[in-house]
């Protein structure tokens, strides 16, 4: 990186408006392709850069019997087709160094952004392995971390081609998260990296349904408007055509039909902030 991510800046960060969106987990080529096509068209309409996201393995599940995904090879082969057909960049999360090596060895052209999950954000070997690739790296801030604690994580990332950090809510008692906008403001003004706001995981209720996580997608639009007003220019949204029947994170995923209204609000507010 030309500058250490620990350098502090006072001026407003000026990054292109960007939205990362897609299903929680990749279920099929037809579904993911449909989501990517619709999301890209909406983002293009509103002058927003679009990146498609999906997980090949939801390793962090509340219960053993919950569906985890269709696997790395199946997912990333479909990513290649989605990239070719729709002309989009792609993001997926990794959970161990072997997965990073598999991606860079056999599926390097299929993935543009490697994401470090929130619960793994302090795993030094994993973070450094991702940063040693030619990929953009997005690190999700753990629900258990203070915003300024990201400084220690960023100190591990000097080799990264490009680095982002994501706010996805903070633990607030049992089975609950809260969004602390003062923390987002701190990261925007103290770290020389783009700060992404994950609005859909921020409304999650971890383990809130007993055997799975709950959530309330109704709060997503308002949180996006607030983040945009604060100056956030990078957003992460999980979207699905039928979230109530999705295999994971259904309660907090945005309905695909509601995606455009959220994008329009973000773009409108961003234009005047």
Can you annotate each of these PLM segments?
Residues 70-71, 88-99, 111-125, 136-147, ...:
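Catalytic beta/alpha-barrel core
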Residues 134-239:
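Catalytic alpha/beta core domains of metabolic enzymes, predominantly
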């Amino acid at each position: 990186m030309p500058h250490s991510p620990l350098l502090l800046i006072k001026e407003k960060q000026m990054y292109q408006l960007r939205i990362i969106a897609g299903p929680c987990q990749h279920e099929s080529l037809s579904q993911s392709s449909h989501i990517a096509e619709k999301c890209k068209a909406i983002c293009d309409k509103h002058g927003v850069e679009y990146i498609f996201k999906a997980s090949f393995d939801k390793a962090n599940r509340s219960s053993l019997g919950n569906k985890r995904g269709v696997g790395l090879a199946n997912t990333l082969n479909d990513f290649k087709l989605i990239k070719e057909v729709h002309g989009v960049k792609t993001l997926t999360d990794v959970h161990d160094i072997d997965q990073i090596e598999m991606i860079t060895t056999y599926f390097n052209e299929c993935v543009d952004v490697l994401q470090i999950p929130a619960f793994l954000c302090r795993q030094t070997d994993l973070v450094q392995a991702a940063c040693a690739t030619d990929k953009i790296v997005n690190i999700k801030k753990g629900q258990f971390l203070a915003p300024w604690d990201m400084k220690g994580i960023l100190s591990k990332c000097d080799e990264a081609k490009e680095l982002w950090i994501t706010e996805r809510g903070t633990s607030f008692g049992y089975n609950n998260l809260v969004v602390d906008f003062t923390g987002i403001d701190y990261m925007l003004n103290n770290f020389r990296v783009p700060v992404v706001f994950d609005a859909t995981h921020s409304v999650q209720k971890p383990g809130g349904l007993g055997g799975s996580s709950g959530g309330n997608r109704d709060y997503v639009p308002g949180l996006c408007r607030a983040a945009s007003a604060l100056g956030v220019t990078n957003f992460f949204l999980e979207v699905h055509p039928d979230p109530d029947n999705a295999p994971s994170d259904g309660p907090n995923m945005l309905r695909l039909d509601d995606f455009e209204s959220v994008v329009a609000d973000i773009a409108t507010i961003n234009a005047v902030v």
